[in-house]
Structures are given as C-alpha cells and as structure tokens.
From Swiss-Prot:
It comes from Escherichia coli (strain K12). Its main location: membrane. The phage shock protein (psp) operon (pspABCDE) may play a significant role in the competition for survival under nutrient- or energy-limited conditions. PspC is involved in transcription regulation. Pfam families: PspC (PF04024). Belongs to the phageshock PspC family. PANTHER family: PHAGE SHOCK PROTEIN C. It comes from the Bacteria. This is Phage shock protein C. It is found in: Cell inner membrane. The chain crosses the membrane at residues 39-59. GO terms for biological process: positive regulation of macromolecule biosynthetic process; regulation of cellular response to stress. It is a single-pass membrane protein. Keywords: Activator, Cell inner membrane, Cell membrane, Membrane, Stress response, Transcription, Transcription regulation, Transmembrane, Transmembrane helix.
Length: 119
C-alpha cells in the first residue's frame, strides 16, 4: 500500500465499477484492492453511517469525472521525480550543445572563417 500519490487524479472508473465506478476510482487513487473499498462502504452503511455514506457516494458519483478510455486502469501520471529527471537530462543535453557552440565560437577556426567571409 503506497498511500496517497499526489500526482494521481481521483476519477470515477465506470468500466471497473458496479454502480457508478466511485469505489473503483477510490481504490485506484489509494492503490488498494477494489473489494476492500466496497467492503468498507458496505460496513459503514451497516454500522450507522448509512446517510453519510450514501450522500458522499452520490456527491462523488456526480462530482468526479469518469476516467478517459485512453487511460488504463492503474495507469498513472509520471511522478515529480521522474519529471525532474527528464528535465535534468534535457538541460544537460542543452548545456552540452551550448558548450560545443561556445568552444567553436571562441576557437581559431571560427575566427579564421569569419575573416575569410569578410574579404
């Protein structure tokens, strides 16, 4: 159980759900089995939280967007560390290109070619 992943969005997953997909979306968000969430919902209904559970379920069923079909169940957005690693690689590649250009501009070859062009 990984807990809350701040990079995930809470969706309704009607493809995996029994009623509107709210329990499946919550299970995907918290990275727990769907059956566990469904059992907790049923237990909360039987142990005195029926009104709260039903109202929350109805509100979530209308408030949450359905998961797009192109996103697979369990698929997640890249984490912030992965995004930072990708940006770091791009910046390193840009720095390498900049150093190569700087080396060429400050070289004798560049000076010689620019003087030939001026003739």
């Amino acid at each position: 159980m990984a807990g809350i992943n701040l990079n995930k969005k809470l969706w309704r997953i009607p493809q995996q759900g029994m009623v509107r997909g709210v329990c499946a979306g919550i299970a995907n968000y918290f990275d727990v089995p769907v059956k566990l969430v469904r059992i907790l919902v049923v237990l909360s209904i039987f142990f005195g939280l029926a009104l709260f559970t039903l109202v929350a379920y109805i509100i979530l069923s209308f408030a949450l967007d359905p998961m797009p079909d192109n996103m697979a169940f369990g698929e997640q957005l890249p984490s912030s560390s992965e995004l930072l690693d990708e940006v770091d690689r791009e910046l390193a590649a840009s720095e390498t290109r900049l150093r190569e250009m700087e080396r060429y501009v400050t070289s004798d070859t560049f000076t010689l070619r620019s003087r030939f062009r001026q003739l």
